[in-house]
């Protein structure tokens, strides 16, 4: 079957971009789907002359009581969406005489602007001559309303009834920096804020002025704190790599690793590498490389913090941020976290319940030392027994030989 016998579905909708080079047929004579605008047939096409569908009225059925209607052009005025009483009567009789079908009720729109049946807008000619057709040019009140017009309905009343509509509005261009209209601007130019140097203060609204000044002052203080922190951080040198941290080549390495119990300066990458070393014991890698003070965790920061109060705030913010992330060792109750109650991450079950912190378990060794551990496994005892040091046979032989000499000497001296 040739594709030329198949009607192009894009051409049927008026959007075929292939044109004459299309492999399908552009003949609408054999096409069953119609390109007539269904909204225009109902009388309220919002696109008007810009609609890509045909604005034509199809002829009525042969058995209908009304003759064929003329085909208006898209540029002509829209007809009234309400059928005449004769048409409505014939349609109702046709549906009521069909056996086996339920009677359909006509949908009634409650919004007058959608239906166009406002009683106060009905011209006298329509009341006097209910069967006649009114000219849309002579009666603009009877023109059908679009959906956009229905949305806009009541906005004027809403603006008029608002409490602040009578007050002049601030010019958005002057508030942003400069208004090219100057004194001829229809909007109100506000007073200049002494902090942000913008015309954003309403001269007649003290609440707006107070709120903006409070917000502006808070932003100004925050920016000043950042400026002071940057000034205090720009010459800090890492004690491990001996480089200025904020002058490193990579932007990801320009971060400080602040120890919780120490005030020495390190970059984040160096102190993390130090604490990940495997050849040292745990107390050594947790301590500061310079002063040997043990710190439980490292806080990443863009700026250097030396004040203890600011440092405490940074530690609390760091703990709160870590507490929102799920612990990868706990695994929602499926695993065991080796850090126990000291873990900064979130220990929660699948249903959202938080796990109670485990109490550290103690073990007393034969030497009298106490060690803490989180879990006890049978394999740990088996491995400890297998790796336990066994005395060598050479030591046993030497011990037995010494006992023999002592025995011989003791026997000779003890005889009577």
UniProtKB/Swiss-Prot annotation:
Annotated catalysed reactions: S-ubiquitinyl-[E2 ubiquitin-conjugating enzyme]-L-cysteine + [acceptor protein]-L-lysine = [E2 ubiquitin-conjugating enzyme]-L-cysteine + N(6)-ubiquitinyl-[acceptor protein]-L-lysine
EC number: 2.3.2.27
This protein's record includes keyword Lyase: no
A Gene Ontology molecular function term of the record: zinc ion binding
Residue span of region Disordered: 61-144
Subcellular location(s) of the protein: Cytoplasm; Nucleus
Record's keyword annotation contains Ribonucleoprotein: no
Highest taxon above the source species: Eukaryota
Pathway linked to the protein: Protein modification; protein ubiquitination
SUPFAM superfamilies in alphabetical order: CCCH zinc finger, RING/U-box
GO cellular component, one term: nucleus
Modified sites of kind Phosphoserine: 139
Biased composition (Basic and acidic residues): 95-123
Entry comment describing in which tissues the protein is expressed: Highly expressed in the testis, and lower expression in the brain, thymus, heart, lung, liver, spleen, kidney, ovary, uterus, and seminal vesicle (at protein level). Expressed in primary immune cells, such as CD4-positive and CD8-positive T cells, CD19-positive B cells and CD11c-positive dendritic cells, and in embryonic fibroblasts (at protein level).
Alphabetized UniProt keyword annotations: Cytoplasm, Differentiation, Metal-binding, Nucleus, Phosphoprotein, Repeat, Spermatogenesis, Transferase, Ubl conjugation pathway, Zinc, Zinc-finger
Zinc finger map (RING-type): 238-292
Pfam families: zf-CCCH, zf-CCCH_2
InterPro entries: MKRN-like, Znf_CCCH, Znf_CCCH_sf, Znf_RING, Znf_RING/FYVE/PHD, Znf_RING_CS
Region: Makorin-type Cys-His, residue numbers: 193-222
Annotated S-S bridges: none
Function: E3 ubiquitin ligase catalyzing the covalent attachment of ubiquitin moieties onto substrate proteins. Promotes the polyubiquitination and proteasome-dependent degradation of RELA/p65, thereby suppressing RELA-mediated NF-kappa-B transactivation and negatively regulating inflammatory responses. Plays a role in the regulation of spermiation and in male fertility.
Self-association and partners: Interacts with PDLIM2 (via LIM zinc-binding domain). Interacts with RELA.
Cited PANTHER family: E3 UBIQUITIN-PROTEIN LIGASE MAKORIN-2, MAKORIN-RELATED
Protein name: E3 ubiquitin-protein ligase makorin-2
